[in-house]
Amino acid sequence: NQFSWETPFYLLSGLGALCFFAACFLPDFKGHIVEKNLQPKPVALLRSMWDDKNQRLALTMGLFLILGHFSTIPFITPFMTRNIGFSQEQITYIYLLGGGFTVFTSPLFGRLTDRFSALKVFQVLILISFAVTLLLTSLETASIALALTLNTLFFVFVSGRMIPAQTLMTSAVGPSGRGSFMSIKSSMQQLAAAIASLVGGLIIVELPSGELENYGWVGVFAVLISGVTLFIAPKLKVAPGN
């Protein structure tokens, strides 16, 4: 609130430059790379991914997770300001608390994923995230403290479920094809984020008073779409070489 709207973009650019500089000092990981003349063509690579049921399921799982994730996120700020009564200054605390707690909970979820199976941790976290999502999006009147608590829990569990999910999805492809797989997965997730935002915008209605209506239905949509992954995750298998 103390700087212009361009400040976050300058910050991201600066952090990106630092990451690029740091990447120059990372060791090379080339053991899995085949000779250049043996590498498949892009079209053949896409076809092999599609023909591999395991990779196809992993890509579908990532798609549905992001569809559910991003249908609600773009509307948190306007919903909190217009419906709950947050000031612009108080909006800062949503992301401060949500991001702050995630810094501590993400490593915890990572350790749980390593200690127990990724599937079990994913199933528990996604079910908790469903409850939090429905509670948050169905708020009508709430104190600032309650709304901040639900927002923080939303950030913790919605982002936390991605940790075991990533483990499940990346293990579905062998080391030699993982880079290509991750590129396709990232592209599909960007597309899913755009579609989810569009769908959320079509469901939500702005009342003459300025309040947003039907955000609760967006929450239901998010839960139903994300719920598909509960049926996909158990079918994923660890690819040879992992």
Predicted region positions:
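Multi-pass alpha-helical transporter architecture, strongest
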Residues: 22-24, 209, 218-242
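Juxtamembrane intracellular "pre-TM" segments in multi-pass secondary transporters
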Residues: 28-61
